[in-house]
Design a protein with these regions (language model features):
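Zinc-dependent deaminase catalytic domain
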Residues: 1-145
């Protein structure tokens, strides 16, 4: 589901999705990286470098999934994400009561933000697990009958 959610992102460089699941394996919420509601994708920059970048504006997938839960309790839940959460998302994960992070990629493993994230998650007792998969692509076939 996190991979499907990532397909909704309009970011030309990085599409990240998140899916929050209850201890009973019920999907509670999904999210993807993008601009806040009401901020047009056409009016804000998607650039990664230069004077005007996306970074001050983009809401990460994890935070969007937490906010999209709209008051549902996330205590004890798991969050599945394409990319290991940054330090800001780790704070939201911890504060929301999510107890496990399952991630697909850790491509920024040695950056200060990711190292801080790992430290906070570990200190807060949040379980972190890398999803091992042999799949390199996800293909959906839809046949209308």
């Amino acid at each position: 589901m996190a991979l499907l959610a990532s397909c909704r992102s309009k970011d030309p460089n990085t599409q990240v999705g998140a899916c929050i699941v209850s201890p009973e394996n019920i999907i509670l919420s999904t999210g993807y990286n993008g601009f806040p509601v009401g901020c047009s994708d056409d009016e804000y920059p998607w650039e990664r470098e230069g004077e005007h970048t996306k970074y001050p504006y983009v809401v990460h997938a994890e935070l969007n999934a937490i906010l999209n839960a709209s008051g549902k309790s996330l205590r004890g839940a798991r969050i599945y994400v394409d990319l290991f959460p940054c330090n800001e998302c780790a704070k939201a994960i911890i504060q929301s009561g999510i107890r496990e992070v399952i991630y697909l990629s850790d491509k920024y493993a040695e950056t200060p933000a990711t190292l801080a994230s790992k430290r906070m998650l570990r200190s807060a007792g949040v379980t972190v697990r890398h999803l091992e998969t042999c799949l390199s692509t996800l293909t959906l076939n839809y046949h209308k009958k």
